[in-house]
Amino acid sequence: MLTALVIDDEQFAREELAELLDETGQVEVVGDASNAILGLKKINELKPDVVFLDIQMPQVTGIELLGMLDPETMPYVVFVTAYDQYAIQAFEDNAFDYLLKPVDPCRLNKTVKRLNKVISQSALTQQLSAITPDTLDQIPCIGHNRIVIMATETVECAYSDISGVHVRSTSQTASTQLTLKTLEEKTPLVRCHRQYLVSIKAISEIKLLENGLAEIITKTGFEIPVSRRYLKVLKEMLGISH
């Protein structure tokens, strides 16, 4: 059964959504919060599978809260709001879904079913990753309702966002339940940004930008950000002294 946290500044809205989730028979509401700050605390404490998050809240909005979460450990996020003008931004920020108030029970059921499907696939991939050796020649990924085994030597980069960790090869991109930390430890990929790893042999060009930042262009033309803290190490690995 999925575990869920409901964050909304209106008590009635929290109670109503909790009741609708309970009626699905597939979700256990483990807590709620009346604002984003308290919600962040409860996310870290309760570690729910999914957060149903209002957007328009005082002081800190739901979208701002989303930006505070660690992409590697954060739960799935479903925005619940009366304002449809936020829909595009929500999906750009990689929210799992977007529900309009008043929440339609049938629409909510569809969201819950999708969540169950995605989380079940994630659990299967985690079982595969649990038996991986100290070094990975292949990376188990999920793509289009199938498990994809991606050869590590073909991987250009790996990156994380709110929807998970993604592995990009010379021919495809797929999602994996392995964390960036695991990929960094068990593959030749090196850290170039908090949310990106890159294969040194895939680098075609490094553009030096302002403020000590940089951007990698891979041999297939993919652009990867490089943060200041990793640029020096990256240069050293490439034999560049300045």
Swiss-Prot record:
Domain Response regulatory: 3-116
GO biological process, one term: regulation of DNA-templated transcription
KW Repeat (keyword) present: no
Domain of life: Bacteria
Domain HTH LytTR-type stretches: 139-240
Modified residues (4-aspartylphosphate): 54
Keyword Iron: no
Pfam families, A to Z: LytTR (PF04397), Response_reg (PF00072)
Annotated keywords: DNA-binding, Phosphoprotein, Transcription, Transcription regulation, Two-component regulatory system
SMART domains: LytTR (SM00850), REC (SM00448)
Gene Ontology annotations for the cellular component aspect, listed alphabetically: cytosol; protein-DNA complex
Molecular function GO labels: phosphorelay response regulator activity; transcription cis-regulatory region binding
NCBIfam families listed in its UniProt record: PRK11697.1
Protein name according to UniProt: Uncharacterized response regulatory protein VP0538
Native organism: Vibrio parahaemolyticus serotype O3:K6 (strain RIMD 2210633)
